[in-house]
Amino acid sequence: MSKIRVSNLAEKLGLEHKEVLARLKEIGVDAKTATSLVDEDVLKKLMPSLSPDGAEEVRVTTTIIRRRAKAAPVVEPAPAAVAESLEEKPAEPVAPAAPTPPEVPAAAPAPPKAAAAPAEAATMNARIIAPPPAPVETAAPVAAAPVAAATAPPEKALPTPPVVEAPVVEAKPEPVVEKPKVPAQPDKPSANQARILGRMEIPGVTTRPTRVVRRDGTVAPAAEHAQRRPSPAAGAPSRGAAPDRSRMKPATLPPSAPPAADDRRKFGGKSAAPHSEGAGKGGKKGGASTAKKKEQPKKHEILEKRERVFDPVYRGSRKKVKERASETRKTEITIPKAIKRIIKISETISVGELAKRMGIKANDLIKSLMKMGMMVTINHALDFETTVILASEYGYEVENMAVDLDEILESTPDAPETLVKRPPVVTIMGHVDHGKTSLLDAIREANVIAGEAGGITQHIGAYDVELNGRKITFLDTPGHEAFTAMRARGAKVTDIVILVVAADDGVMPQTREAINHSKAAGVPIVVAINKIDKPEAKPERVKQELMEFGLVASEWGGDATMVEVSAKKRLNLEGLLEMVLLQADLMELKANPDKEAKGTIVEAKLDRGRGPVATVLVQEGTLKNGDYCVVGVHSGRVRAIHNDRGEKVNEAGPSMPVEVIGLSGVPDAGDVFVSLKDEKQAKEIATLRQIKQREIEMAKHSKVTLEDLYKQIQSGDVKDLNVIVKGDVQGSVEVVSDSFRKLSTDAVRLNVIHSGVGAITETDVNLAAASNTIIIGFNVRPEVKAQAMAEKEGVDIRLYSIIYDAVEDVKKAMEGLLDPTLKEKYLGRAEIREVFSVPKIGNIAGSYVQDGKMLRNAQARLLRDNVVIYEGKLSSLRRIKDDVKEVAAGYECGIGLENYNNIRIGDIIEAFEIEKVATKL
């Protein structure tokens, strides 16, 4: 048995392959795709399923399907009989239709082919059916009857049944089944075109002949009906006019439903007139040819409309299509829901990202910011406050979704039973050169002064001292005015402050500052009056001066503990420590050692062999080797722990200062050190802090207002001095950088473009060469390759060990950038007593020097009646006949003015010179 593909089967049936697959599935044939093979016998099984009710579906529109019953087989009579019947009875008028139409039963299938071309042409016009003279029984199928029966008298006819129209059914679009056999036509369409034609009804093109039923129930051929239809009168309406409804009423067909009213209207108005022009055979032939000619353009037009049904762009006229196309191209401004009008940011957001989230062009946001006085670009970061103001103008709300890292790292309060006593942390503070380090040296019984440049402590130190079995942790802070931040930091992490005041010097500025820092931190103060061994020492005067700051000695009725000591002679040191321990006992200092460690970075540096090294003061818990930790924007794992004497230890408890190795970078002094169990959590927190810090810096640098821009334009002559600062420890680098920034003035601006801990490297030299910068090294040296590169590139490297030397040199360098100040220096004056005219030279003033001296090539001004009429220089100076360099007071001389001859007797010539004086900051 031969097989056929589903796609070929669908093409034969004029259907889509999806419809064929669905039909095959209904009859039990398994076919999955269009390329599946099925038996040819399936075609026979498929035919009944295509039209189970014997009805043909004609799609008029995309949603309306008109069902029309198929006609029964008709036995066509002979042509002669047809002619006789046409001559015997003309067409009679149709009675009015009853309001209630009866049901129309289904009929047998009609013959698929027409007999001849004239009959085919008549079939096209057979939708208007002549009214039958006799009633038709609806139950019996139509059979062939004698032609003579058609001549029955009309008076005996029963009442004419009303015209039955097929109801218009609105349903979802379904594939329309087309008859497999269509009448042969000269312009036969292709398979694809056949599918399209089968989906909708084409007015004027009918694929089966329409029957004319006589009174006896017989069916006449379509050609007979075409001859019997009367031709219109002379005043009949034209092709496009509305037809006469009384002449177009079709008779009721027993076996089939009549065409719809819309079809009759189209047919009657457009196709009836051409067929009525001729008579007889010639009329039929001419009518058929005319119908074919006029049917072609209508077919293309209808096909085009049919195709446009499936394309929403082509609905309606071309003008409407263009309008719809232009409307679709326009940007629709939609208002998002309230929940979508909330923008969530983390601290800051860029202008471009904010515009993207609000669905607004970035240029519009930039314009709004310019109106607010901010000059920004699309990549500038906006802080939370600015974002709230800007978003509110466009109807948006902003939520700050920044992660509070303090809440993540915040520890729960310890239970009282878990707390144990801890050693006190004592910070030594005071004015420069009052003996702070000497006192600590005496307490530690170690010489730490030798390492201090110029006797000045330039970084903070942490030491652990044991006295009578009890430990005390000491923090030594600098006393120089530049180290204010260090003193403030030391006051925050300490329990007790020892204020060192020299007995021979009294209260000084840094002493007052230390008192203020201690009071601000709420830390008790123990005053150590040092240098009492000196003959000029006056401790009573010191106590009296301290009373002005609220520190009253206990022997005077106050609450301040004051101890007179001598660091050099080691006098009364134990008494000082006992007072410190007594104060600690009163404070009841306790901590929980059985928890994760938490502390503060006292100092940090970059060691060439060990990497980043941080001095940590543990405040809570116990720090152990191998712990994961996070410090500021850095994280890491504790690789090694060393105490203040350089000994390696495995753990550090509360109030113990240690050096920690293993961090990813050099942290800032004052950062909080937190120990964690999870390395992943430590890295995440460090990453979040880095992002937050970067966003804040971007927002800080991007805030340029119109006023600032105007000031920069106005002060275009401002000089810039760029420096790179490298130091041994982070605290010293911060102090040096801050000291340099304070030197900036309106005339010279100092920019610290880079700062870091460690030796001066090639990277630093490359940066300095690219940015025309000098490098300041504080207690560090350049590498060998860096030194060679600096000499090659011409980069200036300055090395210092004392901070105020670096500040003074940078200040001088800034002064060198300034233009010198011009100062006028008076030389002398001479009175013109005679005027001599010398050819080719001009007028020479015979003058008498009254005051000072006259110098050749000096600047001069000519005064007449004390009014300056000329200012230039002396071109010549002669004494008698000789050219001289100068003429002193009391002598006569000849003076020539450069390019000026309008001199008179009695004028005064005043000589002066311009001196350039270096500008001071």
Curated annotation (Swiss-Prot):
Molecular-function GO terms, alphabetical: GTP binding; GTPase activity; translation initiation factor activity
Superkingdom of the organism of origin: Bacteria
Region (G2): 455-459
Subcellular location: Cytoplasm
Sequence ranges of Pro residues compositional bias: 96-112
Residue ranges, compositional bias (Basic and acidic residues): 292-301
Positions of the UniProt region annotated as G5: 566-568
CDD domains xref list: IF2_eIF5B (cd01887), IF2_mtIF2_II (cd03702), mtIF2_IVc (cd03692)
Residues the record lists as binding GTP: 430-437, 476-480, 530-533
Keywords from the UniProt entry: Cytoplasm, GTP-binding, Initiation factor, Nucleotide-binding, Protein biosynthesis
Function recorded in the entry: One of the essential components for the initiation of protein synthesis. Protects formylmethionyl-tRNA from spontaneous hydrolysis and promotes its binding to the 30S ribosomal subunits. Also involved in the hydrolysis of GTP during the formation of the 70S ribosomal complex.
Name of the protein in question: Translation initiation factor IF-2
Lineage: Bacteria, Pseudomonadati, Thermodesulfobacteriota, Desulfuromonadia, Desulfuromonadales
Name of the gene encoding the protein in the UniProt record: infB
